[in-house]
C-alpha cells in the first residue's frame, strides 16, 4: 500500500465515523487497533484518546499531537465518504490530523525496527479539543509524568493557505477563548400595566448596545480582538413585560490585559443596567483556552523542517482569532510550536473554511504533514 493509499484509506474511514468530544470511543478503538497491529505500545489515561511511545534510546524526548474529535455539524459534501453519523462531521480536519500522525507513527516504527530512530517520541492522540479541553485533561491526569518531554509539536489544516504552504508565527498564534453570559431578572406584568413590571427587554437592549461598543471604545484598534454577541433572548409573549433576559457570547484576545479590560467593562455594564432598569443583572465568565504561544527557541527547528520537507514557510503577521487547546501543552508541559498546513486547492473546490459543512481537502497534504514531522524528528537538537 502506498502512503497516499494509506492516508486516503484511514482518513476517509475516520471521516465517515466522526464522534463528538469525550465520546470518541470508536475512533479510539480504531487508533489503538492500528497501534497494536504495528506493535507500538500505548496508554489510555482517559476514557478516550491514547498516548503511544517509541524509545529511541536518546537523551531527547519530543511529542507530536493530533486531535481526534468532530463537530455537531451536518455534512453537505456530496462524496462517498461523507459522514454516516447524523449531524456530526469532521468539519475541522481532525480526521486528517489523526491520519497524518498515524502515518508518522508508522514511519517511526520502521526506523525503530532498524535501530535508526533518532529520539524518543511520544504520539498524542488527544480527545476533546473542540469542547472539554482534552489537552488539559491529559496533563492533569498525569499522562506525561513518565516522559521527560522537551518539546511538543502540532499542526492544523488551513483552507486559507495553499497546498504546500505551512503557516507559522512565533509567540501568539491563536487567541484565548472566553465565554460570557449576562443573566437578567426583572418583574413581569401585562403590557397594559407596563409600569408595574420591570422589563428585561429594554434592559437587554441596553446591554447589547453597551457590549457592542466595548471593542470600539475600550480596546486598542491596532490589536486583533473580538467581543462577539452570539445568542440573546428576552420575554415569552408579545403582550407581557419580559421578566427574564439572557445574552451569551465569546471574547477572543491574545493579550491578558485586553481580556481584563473587557471583563471590567462588562461588570460595569451589569451594575449600570441593574440601577437604570431596576432589574437584577449579572455577568459570568467561563474561561476557555489560553492563547497558544509558540516558543521562539523552536523556530529554527521548525523552519528547517519545513524547508527540508520541500514546503513553503508562510510567516503570519498577526495571530488567528480562534481558540485551540494545544495552548495547554506550551503552558504546562514543555516548549511548544503549533503550525498550519495549507489545504486550499481551487481547482478541486477545496476552499471552504473550518467549521463549515463543506470542509474537505486532498489527502496528499497529510503526507506533507508526516514529512514535516519526520524532518523535525531527524533534525531536532541540531544548531
UniProtKB/Swiss-Prot annotation:
InterPro entries: Amidohydrolase, Bact_exopeptidase_dim_dom, Peptidase_M20, Peptidase_M20_dimer. One of its GO terms (molecular function) is hydrolase activity. Its EC number is 3.-.-.-. Keywords: Hydrolase. It is an enzyme of class 3 (hydrolase). It comes from Staphylococcus haemolyticus (strain JCSC1435). Belongs to the peptidase M20 family. The keyword Hydrolase applies. Pfam families: M20_dimer, Peptidase_M20. This is Uncharacterized hydrolase SH1513. It comes from the Bacteria.
Amino acid at each position: 500500500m502506498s502512503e497516499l493509499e494509506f492516508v486516503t484509506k484511514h482518513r476517509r474511514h475516520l471521516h465517515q465515523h466522526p464522534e463528538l468530544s469525550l465520546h470518541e470511543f470508536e475512533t479510539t478503538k480504531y487508533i489503538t487497533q492500528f497501534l497494536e497491529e504495528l506493535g507500538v505500545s500505548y496508554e489510555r489515561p482517559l476514557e478516550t484518546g491514547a498516548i503511544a511511545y517509541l524509545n529511541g534510546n536518546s537523551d531527547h524526548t519530543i511529542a507530536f499531537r493530533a486531535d481526534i474529535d468532530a463537530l455537531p455539524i451536518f455534512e453537505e459534501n456530496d462524496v462517498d465518504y461523507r459522514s454516516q453519523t447524523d449531524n456530526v462531521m469532521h468539519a475541522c480536519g481532525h480526521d486528517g490530523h489523526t491520519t497524518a500522525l498515524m502515518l508518522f507513527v508508522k514511519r517511526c516504527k520502521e526506523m525503530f525496527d532498524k535501530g535508526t530512530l533518532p529520539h524518543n517520541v511520544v504520539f498524542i492522540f488527544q480527545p476533546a479539543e473542540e469542547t472539554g479541553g482534552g489537552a488539559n485533561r491529559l496533563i492533569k491526569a498525569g499522562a506525561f509524568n513518565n516522559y521527560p518531554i522537551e518539546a511538543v509539536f502540532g499542526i492544523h489544516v488551513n483552507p486559507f493557505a495553499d497546498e504546500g504552504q505551512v503557516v507559522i508565527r512565533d509567540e501568539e498564534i491563536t487567541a484565548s477563548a472566553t465565554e460570557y453570559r449576562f443573566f437578567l431578572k426583572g418583574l413581569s406584568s401585562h403590557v397594559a400595566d407596563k409600569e408595574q413590571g420591570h422589563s428585561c427587554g429594554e434592559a437587554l437592549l441596553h446591554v447589547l448596545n453597551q457590549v457592542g461598543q466595548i471593542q470600539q471604545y475600550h480596546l486598542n484598534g491596532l490589536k486583533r480582538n473580538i467581543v462577539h454577541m452570539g445568542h440573546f433572548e428576552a420575554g415569552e409573549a408579545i403582550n407581557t413585560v419580559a421578566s427574564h433576559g439572557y445574552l451569551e457570547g465569546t471574547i477572543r484576545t491574545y493579550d491578558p490585559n485586553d481580556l481584563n479590560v473587557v471583563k471590567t467593562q462588562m461588570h460595569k455594564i451589569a451594575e449600570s443596567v441593574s440601577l437604570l432598569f431596576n432589574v437584577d443583572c449579572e455577568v459570568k465568565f467561563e474561561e476557555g483556552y489560553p492563547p497558544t504561544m509558540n516558543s521562539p527557541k523552536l523556530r529554527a527547528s521548525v523552519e528547517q523542517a519545513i524547508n527540508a520537507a520541500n514546503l513553503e514557510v508562510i510567516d503570519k503577521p498577526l495571530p488567528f482569532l480562534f481558540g485551540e487547546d494545544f495552548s495547554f501543552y506550551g503552558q504546562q508541559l514543555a516548549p511548544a510550536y503549533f503550525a498550519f498546513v495549507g489545504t486550499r486547492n481551487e481547482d478541486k473546490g477545496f476552499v471552504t473554511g473550518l467549521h463549515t459543512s463543506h470542509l474537505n481537502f486532498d489527502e496528499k497534504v497529510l503526507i506533507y504533514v508526516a514529512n514535516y514531522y519526520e524532518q523535525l524528528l531527524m533534525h531536532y537538537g541540531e544548531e
